[in-house]
Swiss-Prot record:
The lineage of its organism: Eukaryota, Viridiplantae, Streptophyta, Embryophyta, Tracheophyta. Keywords: Membrane, Transmembrane, Transmembrane helix, Transport. The gene is PUP13. One of its GO terms (molecular function) is purine nucleoside transmembrane transporter activity. PANTHER family: OS09G0467300 PROTEIN-RELATED, PURINE PERMEASE 12-RELATED. GO terms for biological process: purine nucleobase transport. Disulfide bonds: none annotated. The chain crosses the membrane at residues 35-55, 68-88, 103-123, 129-151, 156-176, 192-212, 238-258, 268-288, 289-309, 323-343. This is Probable purine permease 13. The keyword Signal does not apply. It is found in: Membrane. Its main location: membrane. One of its GO terms (cellular component) is membrane.
Length: 361
């Protein structure tokens, strides 16, 4: 490798590597520390999202029926994030890189998008079977691939493309293996509304991830993880306000006491279910936002889709669901897709290291 090629590779690192590997603002971290943070974020996203989905199913199975409560619990657990935020250095870089007005606009716009997204997902799950819902949710990978390419200049290599395809196929296989049917009594119009809500929610979710990555890299330009928590706290606050307004405007709040009394497992379990769901969704969201900060929005979305494959394992352990051959094949395909993306990050790191060595010579 000559000197000119080495300079080109280093230039690619400064301009584009952070979109497929580690961001430029995190170059100060040792690679070992970076990988530890990535795997911790992956663990939070997959485990917390799986627990949240299981608790959500438990809520509906035991008599819960409020769409706005289902929307609210996805974001109202943000106060727990103030505890770790107290032990992190303040994100002073955000105040110097953009104005307070810009910060407010970012938090408001993303918060409203999250609130709308959560509501649409609640409607989709209400009108669709679990299998149809999961198939439509997997479309977020395709949307995110497009948004990442145009908004974040994500390099869509063959390995990344294979990763997206493998995870999508895996999610579809798991969904097809689910023998649940549409909710009884729903009309064709309700089914159509559920499909449209779920697809539109997947589009908004993918756009939201890409816009978060764009905000971190080009607007906030923060170098601290406190900004990750602040992003999650303030956007969740806005989304929670949207859900609370909807809860009172729709009149569902008047039925909550009856719903609690008629909950099959009792009032205490009802409250614990909602609290556990709120905390789980919040931890999962922190993992998702952290992966956007550490890697990219596309990677965060890939791991989120991977959790759709891990959730059946949790259902097997909790609800004693049957592990079929199709689910086993889907799990294998999902982990292969995950491996493709990890290997792409390894190749990117190796290329940068060789370029640095060539420049040093």
């Amino acid at each position: 490798m000559d000197e000119e090629e080495a300079m080109l590779l280093l230039k690619e690192e400064d301009e584009g590597t952070r979109r497929t590997s580690v961001p430029t603002q995190l170059m100060k971290l040792k690679r070992t520390h970076w990988w530890i943070l990535v795997f911790i974020s992956i663990f939070f996203l997959i485990s917390a999202q799986a627990i949240a989905v299981l608790l959500g199913r438990f809520y509906y199975n035991e008599g819960g029926n409020s769409k706005w409560i289902s929307t609210l619990v996805q974001t109202c657990g943000f106060p727990i994030l103030y505890l770790p935020l107290c032990f992190l250095p303040a994100s002073h870089s955000s105040s110097s890189s953009c104005s307070f007005k810009t910060l407010v606009w970012i938090y408001l716009s993303l918060g409203f998008a999250i609130g709308l997204d959560n509501l649409l997902y609640s409607f989709g799950l209400l009108y669709l079977s679990a299998s149809t819902y999961s198939i439509l949710c997997s479309s977020q990978l395709a949307f995110n691939g497009v948004f990442s390419y145009y908004i974040n200049s994500q390099k869509i290599t063959c390995l990344i493309l294979f990763s997206v395809l493998f995870l999508s196929v895996s999610a579809v296989l798991v969904s097809l293996d689910d023998d649940s049917n549409s909710p009884s009594g729903d009309s064709k119009w309700s089914y159509l509304i559920g499909c449209l809500c779920t697809v539109f929610a997947s589009l908004i979710y993918s756009l939201q991830l890409s816009l978060m990555q764009f905000s971190f890299e080009n607007v906030l330009k923060s170098e601290t993880f406190s900004m990750v928590l602040e992003m999650q706290i303030y956007t969740s606050l806005v989304a929670s306000c949207v859900a609370v307004i909807g809860l009172f405007a729709s009149g569902e709040w008047m039925l909550l006491s009856v719903e609690m009394e008629e909950f099959h497992e009792g009032q205490v379990i009802y409250v614990l279910t909602l609290v556990g769901t709120a905390v789980s969704w919040q931890l999962g969201s922190v993992g998702a936002v952290a992966l956007i900060f550490l890697v990219s929005s596309l990677f965060s979305n890939l791991i989120g889709t991977l959790s759709l494959i891990v959730t059946p394992l949790a259902a097997i352990a909790v609800f004693h669901d049957k592990l079929t051959e199709v689910k086993m094949v889907a799990m294998l395909i999902a982990f292969m897709g995950f491996g493709f993306y990890i290997y792409q990050n390894y190749l990117d790191d190796l290329k940068v290291q060789r370029a640095r060595e060539a420049q040093a010579e």
